[in-house]
Amino acid sequence: METGYIRTKLNNLLLDPNNYRFIDRLDYTQVQEDRIGEDRIQKRTLDFLKGKNNENIEDLINSFKTNGILKQDPIQVKRIGDDKFIVIEGNRRTAALKLLQERYNRNFDIGVLREADF
C-alpha cells in the first residue's frame, strides 16, 4: 500500500458513496468502485454528506472560512486512477471544501480561503 503525502486539486478527490454514515439510510445503495466517479453518484454523495440546508457540514464550512485548512489533519485517500483519489477519511471536510469551492466560483465569501486551497 502506498503511503505518504500528496498534494492534488480538490476536483481530483471523489467522495466515498459507500461511506459508513450512509449504511442505515433507506435510499443507500452499494456503489461499485468503477462507478464512484460518475457525476450523479458524486452529487448524491455530496447531498447525503451536506444534509438539509448544509446542516451536516455547516460547522466545517464556518471553521474553514475562519481558520483555513489545518495541515495537521490531512484527508486520507486511496488512488483509484492516474489522477483520481477516493476519500477514505475526511469525506465531510471534503464535502465542505467542495461547497466552498462552488461558492468561490460564484464569487461568494469564502473567508480566509483562497483559490489555491482548492
Where are these regions (language model features)?
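Short, charged/polar connector segments at secondary-structure boundaries
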Residues: M1-A116
